[in-house]
Amino acid sequence: MKNSNRLILFTLLLFLGGIAKAATDVDTLQTCLDMKGKVPPEQALECYNQKAQELLTKKHPRSFRIARDRGIAEEWAPSDEPVRVYKQNYFLVYSHSSQPNNAPTSPNPNNQVPYTYALDKNEVKFQISLKAHLLGEDKHALWFGYTQLSLWQAYDNAHSNPFRENDYEPELIYSYRPDNLALAGATASFLNAGLVHQSNGQSLPKSRNWNRFYIQAGMERDFGDNGKLALQPRWWKITGGDAVDDDNPDIAHYLGHGEFEARYYYGQGALSAIARIHSLQLDLALPAPRMLGMLIQNANFHLQYFNGYGETLMDYNQRHRTYGFGISMPFE
């Protein structure tokens, strides 16, 4: 792919949010136009007035402070929205690795990937994560979640800019939200139980996958003007697999049996950390420059740092450091 093609693709990604928003605005006003001649003029005028107020509100992206007023418990509250944000959604236009995994290995001899060429240390990294409400109301709800992490060798023109890894992660989640349960100075927000499958969708020898059952708790503490802290520890049990067919039989040694996620919101910024037994990922989201905010509603400038094992499934037993920057969308 030529440099110009990459520029076009990235430009389309930037404008996608603005185009979608403009289409929604047109549909909104069309509702009022369709009322012409069917209702009294006063009622049609009131429709325009109401829709105008809604559109003006959309012109000013909500800040992290506004979004966080609801608390993380509301992230698991059933609503009329067919699709909701799940984990962090970001697009890093530049991600640099200290040590690319040129020949991925595994204790399973069927999963030894031979060396072909040296990967580019610079690439594009992005994650899409959404969830949908299936059943239940109020305190008890069943959700379907989907997360995809992709690493794209967009700057490697010599090898046709391949995607070196795509990790697909569907899951089924039961969520319980207690009523204002205080715990060690914080508020217990939710208790989730889930079944998750993660795979890179590759055939042998590049195939990597694992299945888990997990329990996750969410708690939050509001410090008023000093921000808000959300803690989300998760423990998992690896299921399935055997010594013969398991693509990555020693994955627990590198990724452990759980992770600890912390998010701190202050003003219009957010810092999040995900820690496992042998890895740490830090994400910092800050208000985007005005021009970018006009193109993509609610977009943030995003910085990311990763150190350890398991940035992707293919790299589950490869230790390296990466850092990158790009844009992200806020948590709900």
What is each of the regions a protein language model found here?
Residues 2-8:
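Bacterial N-terminal signal peptides that target proteins for export
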Residues 17-20:
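N-terminal signal peptide c-region/cleavage motif recognized by signal peptidases
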Residues 22-29:
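Cleaved targeting-peptide boundary
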Residues 33, 38, 42-158, 167-170:
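Outer-membrane beta-barrel initiation region
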Residues 55, 302-304, 308-313, 324-331:
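A cross-kingdom marker for long, charged
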Residues 99-113, 120, 135-267, 275-277, ...:
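Outer-membrane pore/translocation modules
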Residues 169, 282-286, 320-332:
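Outer-membrane beta-barrel "beta-signal"
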Residues 270-299:
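Glycine/small-residue-rich hydrophobic helix-like segments
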